[in-house]
A protein has these predicted regions:
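PIN-domain endoribonuclease scaffold, especially VapC-family toxins
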Residues: 3, 13-102, 120-130
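Conserved acidic donor-binding loop of glycosyltransferase catalytic domains
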Residues: 114
């Protein structure tokens, strides 16, 4: 199973034991790496330095992040429509979550996260795994 990791799983170690049995390929989008990179600008120099080290390790583990292309932009538009129809706003912090979801959907992959509520309403299009 192809599984995209949400940013929060790079911040805190995933609970791999919660995964369904089988072999899995773990992927990260460039958007997740971008969101994770916010920590490298932390005002505390020790936290920023650790974030830089962690980013290098994650890039080494997961490779280049999958891109957000026109295809994913079209999927994002559909996700915005779903969210709006449900009475929620697709903007703000939710924007990046929807873009991360669009990359996973475009790749035909599941999305693993700690914060399933960030992706409420997308389940018809996206298999979400709580870790």
């Amino acid at each position: 199973m192809r599984i995209h990791l949400d940013t929060n799983l790079l911040i805190r170690k995933p609970r791999w034991e919660l995964l369904p049995p089988g072999s899995h390929e773990y992927l990260v989008s460039a958007l997740v790496f971008a969101e994770f990179s916010e920590g490298t600008a932390h005002p505390d120099p020790d936290i920023a330095a650790q974030a830089r080290i962690d980013l290098i390790q994650h890039r080494s583990t997961y490779g280049d992040g999958l891109p957000f292309t026109q295809r994913e932009a079209d999927i994002y538009r559909e996700l915005c429509s779903i969210v709006t129809t449900a009475g929620r706003t697709p903007g703000g912090k939710r924007r990046v979550d929807l873009m991360i979801a669009a990359v996973a959907i475009g790749d035909g992959a599941a999305l693993a996260t700690r914060n399933t509520s960030d992706f409420d309403g997308l389940q018809p299009l996206l298999h979400i795994i709580t870790l």
